């Protein structure tokens, strides 16, 4: 394994960490409605748990209301229960075959709590990126010890991985700033 291979592998893993962080951020509720909010909701479909997107069409009625239309009429109750039981504090209302999910306004206190949650998630993502940097540096040391690469190559590789780490940590910080702005916007 060369410096380039190690760098490429680390970059792919860092990108996956960013994607996971992005998915975690999407689950954090802001005052506005978006269909991605319900992506992780699991519905009991004849005894097996399936994502809501497999049993219903999820859309937006307006900026503060999500509409969910189950494909089978008899699934309306199960879908409504799944939305109510998810940890987002939502209160769906059924109107015929359509379930309307209004987004309650966030209190100032809840907004501050959510920004703390976002910062906590960000710290976890940064730790993951830094751990990948550490693993890469250990890999470089091993390659030097095995005399596969020179110490100059090791230093160059460590510098490149550090630049990647800085880039991804900055990207995480940028995403946090955007999410906090979104949460604090009334």
Swiss-Prot record:
It is found in: Cytoplasm. Keywords: Cytoplasm, Protein biosynthesis. One of its GO terms (molecular function) is ribosomal large subunit binding. GO terms for biological process: cytoplasmic translational termination. InterPro entries: Ribosome_recyc_fac (IPR002661), Ribosome_recyc_fac_dom (IPR023584), RRF_sf (IPR036191). Its main location: cytoplasm. The keyword Oxidoreductase does not apply. GO terms for cellular component: cytosol. Pfam families: RRF. SUPFAM superfamilies: Ribosome recycling factor, RRF. PANTHER family: MITOCHONDRIAL RIBOSOME RECYCLING FACTOR PSEUDO 1, RIBOSOME RECYCLING FACTOR. Belongs to the RRF family. Responsible for the release of ribosomes from messenger RNA at the termination of protein biosynthesis. May increase the efficiency of translation by recycling ribosomes from one round of translation to another. This is Ribosome-recycling factor. It comes from Cupriavidus necator (strain ATCC 17699 / DSM 428 / KCTC 22496 / NCIMB 10442 / H16 / Stanier 337). The lineage of its organism: Bacteria, Pseudomonadati, Pseudomonadota, Betaproteobacteria, Burkholderiales.
């Amino acid at each position: 394994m060369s410096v380039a291979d190690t760098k490429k592998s680390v970059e792919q893993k860092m990108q996956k960490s960013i994607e996971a962080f992005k998915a975690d951020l999407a689950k954090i509720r802001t005052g506005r409605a978006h269909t991605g909010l319900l992506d992780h909701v699991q519905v009991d479909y004849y005894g097996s748990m399936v994502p809501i997107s497999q049993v219903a069409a999820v859309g937006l009625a307006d900026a503060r209301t999500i509409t969910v239309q189950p494909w089978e009429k008899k699934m309306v109750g199960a879908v409504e229960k799944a939305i109510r039981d998810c940890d987002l504090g939502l209160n769906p209302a059924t109107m015929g075959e359509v379930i309307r999910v209004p987004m309650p306004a966030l209190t100032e206190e809840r907004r501050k709590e959510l920004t703390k949650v976002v910062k906590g998630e960000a710290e976890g993502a940064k730790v993951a990126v830094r751990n990948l940097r550490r693993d890469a540096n250990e890999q470089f040391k091993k390659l030097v010890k095995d005399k596969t690469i020179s110490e100059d190559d090791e230093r160059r590789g460590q510098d490149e991985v550090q630049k990647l780490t800085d880039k991804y940590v900055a990207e995480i910080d940028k995403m946090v700033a955007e999410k906090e702005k979104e949460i604090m916007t009334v």
